From Swiss-Prot:
Record's subunit section: Homodimer.
Function: Catalyzes the reductive methylation of 2'-deoxyuridine-5'-monophosphate (dUMP) to 2'-deoxythymidine-5'-monophosphate (dTMP) while utilizing 5,10-methylenetetrahydrofolate (mTHF) as the methyl donor and reductant in the reaction, yielding dihydrofolate (DHF) as a by-product. This enzymatic reaction provides an intracellular de novo source of dTMP, an essential precursor for DNA biosynthesis.
Group of enzyme by EC: transferase
Record-given protein name: Thymidylate synthase
GO BP annotations listed: dTMP biosynthetic process; dTTP biosynthetic process; methylation
Predominant location: cytoplasm
Organism (species): Brucella anthropi (strain ATCC 49188 / DSM 6882 / CCUG 24695 / JCM 21032 / LMG 3331 / NBRC 15819 / NCTC 12168 / Alc 37)
């Protein structure tokens, strides 16, 4: 994951110090792209240990179309706690937009199901897109989508994904986003009868919070290790049938976690 460390170093060295919504302050650049070849291993950080349980359960929660944190809490995942209301609701966030985008005529559009149909029927389509950014509902969301649009591309029997992320918390959020969308690409490739290709991560406002600078510098002193591999249960052919037990990260060796505060 030298690619990720290069991003950390680039922003620390070349970023602009700016204010932000949380009042914490950031150092940021605008426009940055990383590429990960999924045939070379699963792109999860080895210079600090990540809580993969949270990443997998959050992705399954998105795919369920769920917007209440009850499922996450039941599975020991707390990453959305700060934004939920007293009933655990988050408003029409990612899962709702992915699986139940509201149309003007009253219909609800299942973007993920439509994507799967297009992959089977017209894999060369340039419309293999899912959007979580719904301007009509942004103000009703507990947190507007940071990773807001992704597109798939099929070539030579391989499925690649490009994600556009409007707001990228490099130290805490981006490592989760890389692993999550890499896994989503692998899952969709499997059910579509394809092999995983690349995950391309395009960042808009790519920032390190001021109270993460020391942690970022510590991480930059560490040497990346060999990437692990992600085993996915080959018997699962339905994207919505995946369960936590269908995934196993093999050969994951990582340095200790580095704690940092969340900017809310």
């Amino acid at each position: 994951m030298r690619t990720y460390l290069d991003l950390l170093q680039h922003v620390l060295d070349n970023g602009t110090d700016r204010g932000d919504r949380t009042g914490t302050g950031t150092r940021s650049v605008f426009g940055y792209q990383m590429r990960f070849n999924l045939e070379e291993g699963f792109p999860v950080l080895t210079t600090k240990k990540l809580h993969l349980r949270s990443i997998i359960h959050e992705l399954l929660w998105f795919l369920k179309g769920d917007t209440n944190i009850a499922y996450l809490k039941e599975n020991g995942v707390s990453i959305w706690d700060e934004w939920a209301d007293k009933n655990g609701d988050l408003g029409p966030v990612y899962g709702y937009q992915w699986r139940s985008w509201p149309a003007p005529d009253g219909r609800h559009i299942d973007q993920i199901a439509n994507l799967l149909k297009m992959l089977h029927g017209n894999p060369n389509s340039r419309r293999l897109i899912v959007s979580a950014w719904n301007p009509a509902l942004v103000d009703e969301m507990a947190l507007p989508p940071c990773h807001c649009l992704f597109q798939f591309y099929v070539a030579d029997g391989k499925l690649s994904c490009q994600l556009y992320q409007r707001s990228a918390d490099i130290f805490l959020g981006v490592p989760f986003n890389i692993a999550s969308y890499a896994l989503l690409t692998m899952m969709i490739a499997q059910v579509a009868g394809l092999k995983p290709g690349e995950f391309i991560h395009t960042l808009g406002d790519a920032h390190i919070y001021a109270n993460h600078f020391d942690q970022a510098r510590l991480q930059l002193t560490r040497i990346p290790k060999k990437l692990p591999t992600m085993w996915i249960n080959p018997d699962v052919k339905d994207l919505f049938a995946f369960r936590f037990e269908d995934f196993q990260l093999e050969g994951y060796e990582a340095d200790p976690t580095i704690k940092a505060p969340i900017a809310v």
